[in-house]
Amino acid sequence: MPRRRGIGHRKILSDPKFSSEMVAKLINIIMVDGKKSIAEEIVYQALTMLAKKIGKPELEVLELALENVRPTVEVKSRRVGGSTYQVPIEVRPVRRHALAMRWIVHSARKRIDKSMIIRLSNELSDAIENKGSAVKKREDVHRMAEANKAFAHYRW
């Protein structure tokens, strides 16, 4: 089989409520054991709760939170002559979105609030205010890239 062409990305259908691909991806990340309707309920209620609290539309609130968590650079291991270097590379836009959503959901799951709706809402709220563990994760990744700036010439 020839391997000339790269694989095209699978198109994700937008969600029913907001017709947004971004919300659909968040729902898919939240989903556990294929229970999409529960994941949709969690995301929609968390966004509605946060939108009421802040006083802005749901999609705008989500975009604000993601903007503050998106990484611009990350490090990748590169083996050169027997030793491994952490080489800083720029993150592609699609991966930025994916990482930001993954970090927010992971941080929300680690919280100790009553329900996932409240945990997700609080984590998004913290992300908007530039605090919380998802923002801390982005800062750690940026700090790591900054510390390894000397190895940037090993980029490929």
UniProtKB/Swiss-Prot annotation:
SUPFAM superfamilies: Ribosomal protein S7 (SSF47973). CDD domains: uS7_Bacteria (cd14869). It holds the Pfam family Ribosomal_S7. PROSITE patterns: RIBOSOMAL_S7. It comes from the Bacteria. GO terms for biological process: translation. GO terms for cellular component: small ribosomal subunit. Keywords: Ribonucleoprotein, Ribosomal protein, RNA-binding, rRNA-binding, tRNA-binding. One of its GO terms (molecular function) is rRNA binding. Part of the 30S ribosomal subunit. Contacts proteins S9 and S11. Belongs to the universal ribosomal protein uS7 family. One of the primary rRNA binding proteins, it binds directly to 16S rRNA where it nucleates assembly of the head domain of the 30S subunit. Is located at the subunit interface close to the decoding center, probably blocks exit of the E-site tRNA. NCBIfam families: rpsG_bact. This is Small ribosomal subunit protein uS7. The gene is rpsG.
